[in-house]
Amino acid sequence: MRTPIIAGNWKMHYTIDEAVKLVEELKPLVKDAKCEVVVCPTFVCLDAVKKAVEGTNIKVGAQNMHFEEKGAFTGEIAPRMLEAMNIDYVIIGHSERREYFNETDETCNKKVKAAFAHNLTPILCCGETLEQRENGTTNDVIKAQITADLEGLTKEQAEKVVIAYEPIWAIGTGKTATSDQANETIAAIRAMVAEMFGQEVADKVRIQYGGSVKPNTIAEQMAKSDIDGALVGGASLVAADFAQIVNY
C-alpha cells in the first residue's frame, strides 16, 4: 500500500519570519493527516522551518540543489549541505527549473543520484507542454524524461523516488488536467517505471499530480487509483487552503 504524499512548493515566496508563521499556523491543522505532509521553502528558510516542525508530522524539502559535492559553483547549494540540515526531500527538475534555468534530463539524473548518496528523497518532476498534449505526444515526451532521469538507479533507489506529474500547461494557469487525464498519464508513467525496473518497483513508486491543485479539486484526484498525492504550488502558501488539501 502506497502512503499518499502531499508536498507544498513555496517557490520564491516568504521571508524566514513569514515561513515560520505559516508552519506554525499549519501544524495544528494537519496533525491528524493520513498522508505524508511536506513543505518546501526557499533555501534561506530551510533551517528555521526544519526547527519549527520538529516533533511534528511535517517533513521538509528543498526546491533544488546542485549535484556536485562542493566547488566553484557560485550561488549553488550542495546535497551534503541539505543532508547536514536533516532535510527530507528535494524537488528535482521542476518545469520552472527546466524552462528558466536550462536544466536538462542529464542534470536531473545526476541530481537524483546525488540525492540518494546524501539520504535525500527526490521528488522528480516531469510533464508536457500544451502543444505536446494537443499533438498527442504526451507519453513520448514523458517517457524520454523518465528514462533519462532515472537511468542507472538501483531498484531499491527507484522505488523510493517520488515522481510529480506536472502538465506544464496547468501550472499557475488555473487550467487543470481533469482527474481522468491526470490518472491516465500517471498510470502510463507507472508503466514506464515498470518497463525500466519491474512491476514490483512500479507498484511502490508514489506518483503525485501537480498543476493548479486546489482544495476543491483534490478529493476527486485522490479518489483515482494511480494518483498518490499532489505537488501543490499557490494553494500551499495559505495554511487553511493547504490543510484542506492535505486533509482531503
UniProtKB/Swiss-Prot annotation:
Q: Where does the protein end up?
A: Cytoplasm
EC annotation from Swiss-Prot or TrEMBL = 5.3.1.1
The record lists the catalysed reaction(s) as: D-glyceraldehyde 3-phosphate = dihydroxyacetone phosphate
GO cellular component annotations, sorted alphabetically?
cytosol
- What is one Gene Ontology biological process annotated in the Swiss-Prot or TrEMBL record? glyceraldehyde-3-phosphate biosynthetic process
Which GO-annotated molecular functions does the record name?
A: triose-phosphate isomerase activity
- Alphabetically list the UniProt keywords: Cytoplasm, Gluconeogenesis, Glycolysis, Isomerase
Pathway annotation: Carbohydrate biosynthesis; gluconeogenesis; Carbohydrate degradation; glycolysis; D-glyceraldehyde 3-phosphate from glycerone phosphate: step 1/1
Q: Which InterPro entries match?
A: Aldolase_TIM, TIM_sf, TrioseP_Isoase_bac/euk, Triosephosphate_isomerase, Triosephosphate_isomerase_AS
Does this entry carry the keyword Translocase?
no
Tell me, in one coarse class, where this protein mainly resides: cytoplasm
Quote the catalytic residue positions.
94, 166
Residues engaged in binding substrate: 9-11, 172, 212, 233-234
Keyword GTP-binding listed? The answer is no
Function comment: Involved in the gluconeogenesis. Catalyzes stereospecifically the conversion of dihydroxyacetone phosphate (DHAP) to D-glyceraldehyde-3-phosphate (G3P).
Listed under subunit, the entry gives: Homodimer.
User: Family assignment?
Assistant: Belongs to the triosephosphate isomerase family.
Protein name (record): Triosephosphate isomerase
Tell me the organism: Clostridium perfringens (strain 13 / Type A)
Q: Per UniProt, what is the name of the gene that codes for the protein in this document?
A: tpiA
